[in-house]
Amino acid sequence: MRYTVITLFPNLVRPWLEESLLKKALERGLIRVEVVDLRAFGLGRHRTVDDTPYGGGAGMVIRPDVAVAALERALPADEVVLLSPAGRPFTQKVAEELAGKEHLVLLAGRYEGFDARVEAFATRILSIGDYVLMGGEVAALAVLEATARLVPGVIGDPQSHREDSFVRGLLDYPQYTRPPEFRGLRVPEVLLSGHHQEVERWRRQEALRRTLALRPELVARAPLSLLEARLLAEMDREE
C-alpha cells in the first residue's frame, strides 16, 4: 500500500515513520510513504503558499493553485483524503475501506485550512474528532496508522486487529498481564482459570459493560451476537 502525505511541515511526519511497526512495515516493503513538502509548490521567490481570506477575517488560507499543484504531482491515486474538522468522522469502518486501496493521498492543512475549492479535488473529507488542531498532520498520521495496521503482515498476529475496539461495534475488553496482584488490585480469577469458554464469555461481557459505561451510543447500533444479546439482557436485569 502506498501513501502520499502533503504537508507544510514534513519534519512533523517523517519521525513518526522511523519507529515501531511503521518502520518495520516500510523496511519490509509492506507500505510505502512519500512525504511531500507543500512549500516546494509555493509561488515566487518566497514560495508563498497562502493568502488573506476574501471577505476578511483572521488567519491565512492555503491557496488552491498551490495545493492542487502538489496534489496533481501525486496522482493517480485511489483516494484523495482532505483532513478537516469539518469532515465526516473517521471511523474503524472507514479505515477498513481505505485499507483496501493501493494509493492514498493525505492532504494536511495549516492556518485557516485550504481554500474551499480544493475540496473539489478530494474524494473524501475526514475529521478525527470534534476539536481543532494546529494542523492536519496529526490527523493524517492517524489515518495512515489506522489503515497501515490493517495491511496484511504489518501486525504479526492478524487476530490482534480482529479483536480491536470498534471492529465488532463495541469497545475492547479490559486487558491484564503479570503480576496477578498489584497494590491490592487483582486480575479477575476467570482469566487465570484456563477455562477458554468462560474467558470468552467474560471478555464479551466486559466489552459490553465497558461500552455501556463509556460509549453507550455504540451499543444501540452494534451487531450483537446471540451471546452478547443474552449478556446484555442479564446486565439489564441486574440493574
Swiss-Prot record:
GO BP term, example: tRNA N1-guanine methylation
Leader sequence residues: none
This protein's UniProt keywords: Cytoplasm, Methyltransferase, S-adenosyl-L-methionine, Transferase, tRNA processing
One annotated Gene Ontology cellular component of this protein: cytosol
InterPro entries referenced in this protein's UniProt entry, alphabetically: Alpha/beta_knot_MTases (IPR029028), tRNA_m1G_MeTrfase_C_sf (IPR023148), tRNA_m1G_MeTrfase_TrmD (IPR002649), tRNA_m1G_MTases_N (IPR029026), tRNA_MeTrfase_TRMD/TRM10 (IPR016009)
UniProt superkingdom: Bacteria
GO molecular function, one term: tRNA (guanine(37)-N1)-methyltransferase activity
Chief location of this protein within or outside the cell: cytoplasm
Location(s) in or outside the cell: Cytoplasm
Binding site for S-adenosyl-L-methionine: G109, I128, G129, D130, Y131, V132, L133
Disulfide bond entries: none
Family: Belongs to the RNA methyltransferase TrmD family.
Summary of the function given for this chain in its UniProt record: Specifically methylates guanosine-37 in various tRNAs.
Protein name: tRNA (guanine-N(1)-)-methyltransferase
Upper lineage: Bacteria, Thermotogati, Deinococcota, Deinococci, Thermales
Gene: trmD
